[in-house]
UniProtKB/Swiss-Prot annotation:
Binding site for ATP: G19, L20, S21, G22, A23, G24, K25, S26
UniProt entry tagged with the keyword RNA-binding: no
Xref: SUPFAM superfamilies: P-loop containing nucleoside triphosphate hydrolases
Domain of life according to the entry: Bacteria
Role: Displays ATPase and GTPase activities.
Similarity-based family: Belongs to the RapZ-like family.
Pfam families given in the database record: PapZ_C, RapZ-like_N
UniProt key word ATP-binding: yes
Protein name per the record: Nucleotide-binding protein Mmc1_3333
Listed GO MF terms: ATP binding; GTP binding
Keyword tags: ATP-binding, GTP-binding, Nucleotide-binding
Length: 310
């Protein structure tokens, strides 16, 4: 609203995608384009308010995704901090998504694609003509420079273990325009195998390895927690059902309080050894329960189709 009390036109939603070079920003932006967002990659930051004003006046329902890259941010490291409150007034929904990955993985990606890191090969601060950055040094320098932006992010995704398709699905799940999500929060419920490592972006991690393991029943070994014989096996002693009853009470208590704190996303991972039987069963059941409670739920099984493992 301006000084005369006139409502300022607003863009429906603005998703700013920032993060480390090689972490998947282009993949994330393409995913947003696929679900209906107007994709603007690396515009001059200072031009964003004017651009948002034009878009808000030209259409009633404007969903915009903007890529923020090191090249643009490096010219004025404090620009985003100054612009964020201005853009907040101009958009009904402003989200800053930050993508990162382990340094060794980023170096590997640059080597495989033969792309040049925006900071590689340049003189290091205080160095002479010989003090040129390696790719690894460039990655670490960028991580340091982008830290103020990361600190302001609504959501951080670590793409170390994410294939491009997995990242596309994750972004689409997060920002898909869903008119039926009246609760204001999206719940991600994911199964995984601890032997393959944990996700770094989970809000809560639960361990299902206390349940009897269907792996040791040869008739069930090649099946998954989505198959009826495995579900019957896990239902047999009542432990899984009792655990789910406790989870229903826990989330019935927690989620309304997270909504009150304006938390838009909550991710819970449930793991077992291989991510094939117990965690898959529990995640499917928990997803059903949370959906029946009126929440938007996204279920993902990270390791279900890996080779059978204990």
């Amino acid at each position: 609203m301006d000084e005369h009390g006139v409502q300022t036109p607003q863009v429906t939603s603005l998703i700013v995608v920032a993060g480390l070079s090689g972490a998947g920003k282009s993949t994330a932006l393409k995913s947003l384009e696929d679900i209906g967002y107007l994709w603007i990659d690396n515009p001059p930051l200072l031009a964003l308010p004017g651009l948002m004003r034009e878009l808000s006046e030209s259409t009633e329902d404007s969903h915009v995704a903007v890529g923020l890259h090191m090249r643009e941010h490096g010219r004025d490291p404090d620009a985003w901090q100054r612009l964020q409150p201005i853009l907040q007034e101009m958009t009904a929904r402003l989200e800053l998504l930050y993508l990162e990955a382990d340094s060794d993985i980023l170096v590997k990606r640059f080597r495989e694609t033969r792309r040049r890191h925006p900071l590689a090969g340049r003189n290091m601060a205080g160095g002479g003509g010989e003090a040129l950055r390696t790719v690894k040094e460039a990655v670490e320098e960028e991580r340091l420079r982008m830290q103020p932006v990361r600190a302001q992010a609504n959501l951080v995704i670590d793409t170390t273990y994410l294939r491009p398709q997995m990242l596309q699905e994750r972004v689409a799940d997060l920002f898909r325009m869903d008119a039926h999500n009246t609760q204001g929060i999206t719940l991600f419920v994911r199964s995984l195998g601890f032997k393959y490592g944990s996700n770094t972006d989970a809000d809560m991690v639960l361990d299902a390895r206390f349940l009897q393991n269907p792996y040791y029943d040869l008739a069930l070994r090649e099946l998954t927690g989505m198959d009826a014989p495995v579900r019957a096996f896990l239902d047999r002693d009542g432990e899984a059902e009792q655990f789910l009853t406790h989870l229903q009470g826990l989330f019935g208590y927690l989620i309304p309080r997270y909504i009150k704190e304006r938390k838009c996303y909550f991710t819970v991972d449930i793991g077992c050894t291989g991510g094939q039987h117990r965690s898959v069963y529990l995640v499917d059941r928990l997803g059903e329960m949370l959906g029946q409670m009126g929440y938007r739920v996204v279920v993902r099984h990270r390791d279900m189709h890996r080779k059978s493992a204990k």
